[in-house]
Regions:
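Solvent-exposed, amphipathic alpha-helical segments
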Residues: 36-47
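Structured, amphipathic secondary-structure segments that form assembly/contact surfaces
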Residues: 1-8, 13-31, 45, 50-161
C-alpha cells in the first residue's frame, strides 16, 4: 500500500500497481471507524453463556480497559451475566449508525447508536445504546483489531425501546 497525498494505491510484492480504484483516505478512515464502532458495540454488549468471556477479552483490544470494565460492571450489577449463565439469556448488539463524527489532531470524536436485543426465554427486550468516544489510529492487529482504531475514551447511555 502506498499513500500518495490523499490517495492510496495498492501494489503487489513485486512493486507492480494492482488494478484498484484509488480511494480518498478520509473516506477510508471513516469506513474503518464505522467498522470499529460496530465491533466495539458488539463485543462490549453481545454475549451468551458460551461467549461472554471471549467477547470481553476481544473488547479490550478495541477500547480502553477502564471504560470497558465500567460497562462490564454494569452488566454484572444488572445480573445480565448471571441471567446468561443460569437462565440462557442471549444479548445481541447490532450497530445502527454514526450520529456525529469530528476529527481534530488525529483524534476521532464519534457518537453512534446501536440496538441491544435481550432474549430471555420467551421474553424479548430492546435497548438503544448511544455510545460516545474518542478514537485514535493504531496499528491493526489481526484478528483482534482489524480496523486500526482504538477508543481512548468511551461511554454508553441506554434507552429502553
Amino acid at each position: 500500500v502506498i499513500i500518495m497525498g490523499s490517495k492510496i494505491l495498492v501494489v503487489n510484492e513485486n512493486g507492480e500497481y494492482l488494478k484498484q480504484k484509488a480511494m480518498d483516505t478520509d473516506k477510508l478512515y471513516e469506513e474503518l471507524l464505522q467498522a470499529h464502532c460496530s465491533s466495539t458495540a458488539y463485543y462490549l454488549n453481545s454475549f451468551d453463556r458460551l461467549s461472554w468471556q471471549e467477547n470481553q477479552a476481544h473488547a479490550l483490544f478495541l477500547v480502553s480497559k477502564p471504560d470497558a470494565t465500567a460497562i462490564f460492571a454494569k452488566y454484572r450489577a444488572d445480573r445480565a451475566y448471571g441471567d446468561a449463565l443460569e437462565l440462557g439469556a442471549v444479548y445481541r448488539n447490532k450497530f445502527e449508525k454514526i450520529i456525529s463524527l469530528s476529527v481534530e489532531n488525529g483524534q476521532y470524536h464519534v457518537i453512534f447508536s446501536s440496538v441491544l436485543t435481550i432474549i430471555n426465554g420467551s421474553d424479548t427486550k430492546e435497548v438503544r445504546i448511544i455510545s460516545e468516544g474518542t478514537a485514535i489510529r493504531v496499528r491493526p492487529r489481526f484478528p483482534e483489531n482489524i480496523s486500526g482504531f482504538f477508543f481512548r475514551t468511551y461511554n454508553q447511555q441506554y434507552e429502553n425501546l
